[in-house]
Amino acid sequence: MKITTLKKAAVAFAAVGALALTVAAGPASAEMKEQEFRVVGTWGFLDHWKEREGPFWNERLPKLSGGKLTANAKSQTELGLSGYEIMRLLKLGVFDAVHGVTTYVAQDSPAIEGADLAGVIQDLPTYRKANEAYRHILAREFEEKYDAKLLMIYAWPSQQLFCNLGDKSVTEYGLDKLAGKKIRTYSTTLGDFIAGVGGTAVTIAFAEVVPALQKGVADCGLTGTLPAYNAKWWQVVTHNIRIRLGYASSFLAMNLKKWNSLDEETQNFFKAQLAPLEEEMWAATAINDQRGMDCNAQGPCDTQVGNMTAIEPTAADKVMLQSVVENFVLKRWAKRCGTQKCVDEWNATIGKISGMKAAL
């Protein structure tokens, strides 16, 4: 996809999103209670925060509510947070609402982790369909484990491998060659994938990955295509191995006590405004996935190209991925899940859509 096409697509979905946000609900009534929300977004240097999360809370919400609803919204980067702690802080009432990645907050609920098991789905439309089918399970788990109201689900560009192989002229590098490599991960399920290919998982927060790759703490890293570009991974790695392991299932949740304190008009106002924002998120993810791959490699790109060597998965890689998913990812997750109900719910939703099956 050419960069001009990407720009046109971006303008189109932004215009649709802005229009939807304008017409989704009428203006707030004079009786709506004035209040400010304490909000944490995702990473401050990435696209979702800069173009959607931040502008929604700091600009759109006040404008669309006639100044009744405002927010003190900051990215987790600005607050010095890693993302792993945000749901526990939300439960404590430190914040009113948080954006986050499901696998970052699945410590207390393997069922939440089930939304984004590594390697199960390799295309975004199917991934979204699966997450929608699983939404009610996520909503229940957020309420029961974290006293939180799930308000939105979205995703990031596909999670792929980025490795420093030392020589950019290398054009063939299969999953079978990852054995013995130290690979950055951010979730247990990605760690299961790494174990399946014979690598060593190294858990590193996103903001700390570039120095870790630079110093050899990790040989490779897993993240989204555009996040890797925006974080300048191309300065410290040589190759992008384009095996898709998921799309970093993400969410917006509000403290349940705070949500329940809102009157019906305010709750409905939020629902009406967040629905089109969620559509914007998914549309942006589709565009940014390709943009990230292009910019990390040889372009086209509207900024500096990363000059990584791109390696597409072979038929043998796809066979190996299937085996790793079945024998490591699903088996280990089912064991963490621990109950037949948990496994059955996944099989009836994401499993049914993906054609995969988990078993205790």
Please annotate each region the language model reported:
Residues 11, 15-17, 30-125, 149-360:
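N-terminal secretory/targeting leader peptides
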Residues 122-145:
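A gly/proline- and charged-residue-enriched helix-loop-helix capping module
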